Curated annotation (Swiss-Prot):
PANTHER family: HEAT SHOCK PROTEIN 70KDA. The keyword ATP-binding applies. Keywords: ATP-binding, Chaperone, Nucleotide-binding, Phosphoprotein, Stress response. Induction: By stress conditions e.g. heat shock. Belongs to the heat shock protein 70 family. Residues 579-605 are annotated as: Disordered. InterPro entries: ATPase_NBD, Chaperone_DnaK, Heat_shock_70_CS, HSP70_C_sf, HSP70_peptide-bd_sf, Hsp_70_fam. The modification Phosphothreonine is found at residue 175. Acts as a chaperone. SUPFAM superfamilies: Actin-like ATPase domain (SSF53067), Heat shock protein 70kD (HSP70), C-terminal subdomain (SSF100934), Heat shock protein 70kD (HSP70), peptide-binding domain (SSF100920). This is Chaperone protein DnaK. Gene3D superfamilies: 1.20.1270.10, 3.30.420.40, Actin, Chain A, domain 4 (3.90.640.10), Substrate Binding Domain Of DNAk, Chain A, domain 1 (2.60.34.10).
């Protein structure tokens, strides 16, 4: 069985880890970082950039740079790039492809399976969309687990012999979750979960952006939010200011030439104190308190029974957030986990459980929202209450609402409201062929089945006729099998194009390197090379120079090889006479130009440089 990777597919950043020798290891990406920005950008020539290189050019290419796509998972939202619509699943798949490639480079083998984390408060549509994204990226998603639960796995792996209750406070780039767990004897049991899928670091950035924009507007009468490029610069500055204020009491926001009017160019030079930052983001911090109260209430425990507080997500580095959690719980949060990496580490641990590498660990998660069906009068009748341990299955008998009714439409809903219309409809299906009878007589058994991924299947059985209908919930906002297959093929096509681009960069780089080394060596060898031999080398050298900027890669490779062989023959002759090593001719090494001899990191530096040059 191949390696199963654990992926934290985040709103702003993503991370991947794997089990090695019984220990989870965070995989460094091709840029040398342990996290990858969840950013995708499309270039004018159709090239696609993912991660740090995409984020770097977002200011100059705001219209074709996609950020925080996770906030739209499970919705009908589309991204229009040059007339082509991309779903959130397809954009997320591009990030996953990059993560998959980095993992394969690290492991030296193909990776086809993964455990992916989602916010605990993600509904069924959002979870299914995440699985679809994995499939498009060429990954079989073996398990979807909740982010706070993954963090608890990372925290508790070496503490399995003790029994204690923990609260996981997870404030990421785009979502907020809080989970109450009980750890003991290798069992990780989620007692309750709550959260807000529209609260995260992006919202803190937005508050700072609005503050800067309003201050500038008051002074200059110009609203920078109407200018896309200025807006992108504002966002970058706001995020930087937020990060700096986590360790400093004041930061300077300096954006020269942010815009211009009839009087000339305009600049931003603004000091932002931590106190002001806390003031403008106070409501966001307070929004995280109520979910904590609800989670404790649902778990039927008091705050005094919580022994450990774990902070997860980059936004928990904000001092006001830490202070709010401390004030609410009366305890100092634990410093035992890395907030940026622990979710991916936990996912890798779960992957290890699936492969058998991690033993004696049992994970008992819960469904975050109540599941039920719409009944007479539009009432939402619950079958599975929120915070029920999964996997689970539950059945209930219903009947018809009218005389001689021969079919029923079953509307599956998810949420906590009393009326069906106020909850999210996950899907509808019809049970036909019911024998005509007075209302209330037919017995229709509705069964809900939730798997370990939190994905729902619903069936209805007419106990009188034996007729049955069922549905695996795939909301209308998700992709059908045909759309997923199409997206998979496009993703493979992109991967092939990326491979060709990289091959081109390596080929051109090898040619340039060889030309430089050959000219340098000829100069250093001087008269030691006969005129005849020098003419032969020069002929091959000029032939390579003539075609190296063309599109025929095979011809360039052939010319590179011919020059390598010709010069090696000449240098061998020179150094044989001197009793030396031909590979030291003027520092010349015939293998140095070969891509196979370059370190992976060097390849990536060249790759990035090539892309940046293209943008100019």
């Amino acid at each position: 069985m191949g390696k199963i990777i654990g992926i934290d597919l985040g709103t702003t950043n993503s991370c991947v880890a794997v089990m090695e020798g019984g220990e989870p290891v965070v995989i460094t990406n091709s840029e040398g970082a342990r996290t990858t920005p969840s950013v995708v950008s499309f270039q004018a020539d159709g090239e696609r950039l993912v991660g740090q290189v995409a984020k770097r050019q977002s200011i100059t290419n705001p219209d074709k740079t996609i950020i925080s796509i996770k906030r739209h998972m499970g919705t009908s939202y589309k991204v229009d790039i040059d007339g082509k619509n991309y779903s959130p699943q397809e954009i997320s798949a591009m990030v996953l492809q990059k993560i998959k490639a980095d993992a394969e480079s690290y492991l030296g083998e193909s990776v086809t399976q993964a455990v992916i984390t989602v916010p605990a408060y993600f509904n069924d549509s959002e979870r299914q969309a995440t699985k679809d994204a994995g499939k498009i990226a060429g990954l079989e998603v073996l398990r979807i687990i909740n982010e706070p639960t993954a963090a608890a796995l990372a925290y508790g792996l070496d503490k399995m012999d003790s029994n204690h209750k923990i609260l996981v406070y997870d404030l990421g780039g785009g979502t907020f979750d809080v989970s109450i767990l009980e750890l003991g004897d290798g069992v990780f049991e989620v007692l309750s979960t709550n959260g807000d899928t529209k609260l995260g670091g992006d919202d803190f950035d937005q508050k700072v952006m609005d503050y800067i924009a309003e201050t500038f507007k008051a002074e200059n009468g110009i609203d920078l939010r109407q200018d896309k490029m200025a807006l992108q610069r504002l966002k970058e500055a706001a995020e930087k200011a937020k990060i700096e204020l986590s360790s400093s009491m004041q930061t300077n926001i300096n954006l020269p030439f942010i815009t211009a009017d009839a009087t000339g160019p305009k600049h931003i030079d603004l000091n932002l104190t931590r106190a002001k930052f806390n003031e403008i983001t106070h409501d966001l911090v307070q929004r995280s308190i109520e979910p904590m109260k609800k989670a404790l209430s649902d778990a039927a425990i008091s705050i005094d029974e919580i022994e450990k507080i774990i902070l997860v997500g980059g936004s928990t580095r904000i001092p006001a957030v830490v202070e709010a959690v401390k004030n609410f719980t009366g305890k100092d949060p634990s410093k035992g986990v890395n907030p940026d990496e622990c979710v991916a580490v936990g996912a890798a641990v779960q992957a290890g459980v699936l492969t058998g590498e991690v033993k004696d660990v049992l994970l008992l998660d819960v469904t975050p929202l109540t599941l039920g069906i719409e009944t007479a009068g539009g009432i939402a009748t619950p079958l599975i209450e929120r915070n029920t341990t999964i996997p689970t299955k539950k059945s209930q008998i219903f009947s018809t609402a009218a005389d001689s009714q021969t079919s029923v439409e079953i509307n599956v809903v998810q949420g906590e409201r009393q009326m069906a219309m106020d909850n999210k409809s996950l899907g509808r299906f019809t049970l036909s062929g019911i024998a005509p009878a007075p209302r209330g007589i037919p017995q229709i058994e509705v069964t809900f089945d939730i798997d370990a991924n939190g994905i729902v299947k619903v069936s209805a059985l007419d106990k009188g006729t034996g007729k049955e209908a069922n549905i695996t919930i795939t909301a209308s906002t998700n992709l059908n099998d045909e759309e997923i297959d199409k997206a998979v093929k496009e993703a493979e096509k992109f991967a092939e194009e990326d491979k060709k681009r990289k091959e081109k960069v390596e080929t051109l780089n090898n040619a340039d390197q060889l030309i430089y080394q050959t000219e340098k060596a000829l100069t250093e060898l001087g008269d030691k090379v006969s005129a005849e031999d020098k003419a032969k080398v020069t002929e091959k050298l000029e032939a390579l120079k003539a075609i190296k900027d063309g599109e025929d890669l095979e011809a360039i490779k052939k010319a590179t090889e011919e020059l390598t062989q010709e010069f090696y023959a000449v240098s061998s002759k020179v150094y044989a006479a001197a009793g030396g090593d031909p590979s030291q001719a003027g520092g010349f090494d015939p293998n140095a130009a070969g891509g196979a001899q370059q370190a992976p990191h060097d390849d990536n530096v060249v790759d990035a440089d090539f892309k940046v040059d293209d943008d100019k």
